[in-house]
């Protein structure tokens, strides 16, 4: 959430910063409400001051036995009552304006970092580096063709169970998924992350805190009878884990890793990636999350990205690192580095992790603070997939495919999977 004081005092600055995202945000309309709210505050303070003075006068009059029932005293009491009624009316107006301001500010995205490349869309993203040797051959099978041939998953039966864009993993497919989850959790835990296993259901306040609500309400699954939603990413419960807390600066950075199922409607993706593991309503993901000292989040961003990269390197999967431009940034992000894994059947890279520095944006929405130089400040939060399991499996199947139809399992995964190959029966 953006700073309300900044919007009130410098709306043009806020508008200009948000315009870097390639979209106009009418900050001056919000500014008018904040000014009106400030004026009401002044009126309330003035009335309370007058009421306080009047109370002293009434007290003096009451102590005077000659004035205990005087007409003048009754007039003073009546005036005091009018002050209280007026203050109450202004307080109610202020409450309504506060809610209006909060509702409008919650719709505003984060400021892009001054270090993020300027651009309108993904075509303006900048490749930082490539790693590995991408497999470039003709007539390679897609991961869903490989999966069907090896009986790793079934989408037809899943449609009977639920609907399209769901998958049932079976046999070696389920085993590979479990192996990847355990491998990733072990790597990150050994790298200083504390493993959490949060609820798969989250309340509206948690979604609001991480930035999914109100903007992305149509992209999430909501329970009919409760204020609960299926979590779209572990980023949501991990942000809420320290909601309304002041964290001891000596504990920073706090580094968490969590495996969780994720649920998304994929409302804007009709017709895209309809087969395979790339875009599903339900998928598994290992999430990395940092609570950082505000003065150290730039370095933390490099570290969390490197931690996600390490999984791809250990699995020997070719990838590239991309700096996301201002117009393609996620709602809560100030700066994002994407990791994109090579899918040889498509002859292109596909996103497998977004590592974002949200600075104090989520912390303001969730009221998460720390002490810096004896002053209370909002903490900085960072998140990144470490990694998305389904997309990692897709990359392993495609990059590890062999002419005989089998798939080579990455060496580091063999102890978890129990075999170096997935073969046809």
Curated annotation (Swiss-Prot):
A Pfam family found in this protein is tRNA-synt_2b
Q: In which pathway does it act?
A: Aminoacyl-tRNA biosynthesis; selenocysteinyl-tRNA(Sec) biosynthesis; L-seryl-tRNA(Sec) from L-serine and tRNA(Sec): step 1/1
Swiss-Prot/TrEMBL GO biological process terms: selenocysteine biosynthetic process; seryl-tRNA aminoacylation
Concerning its family, UniProt says:
Belongs to the class-II aminoacyl-tRNA synthetase family. Type-1 seryl-tRNA synthetase subfamily.
- List the top taxonomic levels of the source: Bacteria, Bacillati, Cyanobacteriota, Cyanophyceae, Synechococcales
Q: What does this protein do?
A: Catalyzes the attachment of serine to tRNA(Ser). Is also able to aminoacylate tRNA(Sec) with serine, to form the misacylated tRNA L-seryl-tRNA(Sec), which will be further converted into selenocysteinyl-tRNA(Sec).
Under the heading PROSITE patterns, the entry gives:
AA_TRNA_LIGASE_II (PS50862)
Q: What is its EC number?
A: 6.1.1.11
What GO molecular function annotation could you give as one example from this UniProt entry?
ATP binding
> Where does this protein reside within or beyond the cell?
Cytoplasm
Where along the chain is L-serine bound? 233-235, 287, 385
Q: Which cysteines are joined by disulfide bonds?
A: none
Annotated positions binding ATP: 264-266, 351-354
Name the record gives this protein: Serine--tRNA ligase
GO cellular component terms? cytoplasm
- Which chemical reaction does it catalyze? tRNA(Ser) + L-serine + ATP = L-seryl-tRNA(Ser) + AMP + diphosphate + H(+); tRNA(Sec) + L-serine + ATP = L-seryl-tRNA(Sec) + AMP + diphosphate + H(+)
What does the comment on domains in this protein's record state? Answer: Consists of two distinct domains, a catalytic core and a N-terminal extension that is involved in tRNA binding.
> What top-tier enzyme class does this entry carry?
ligase
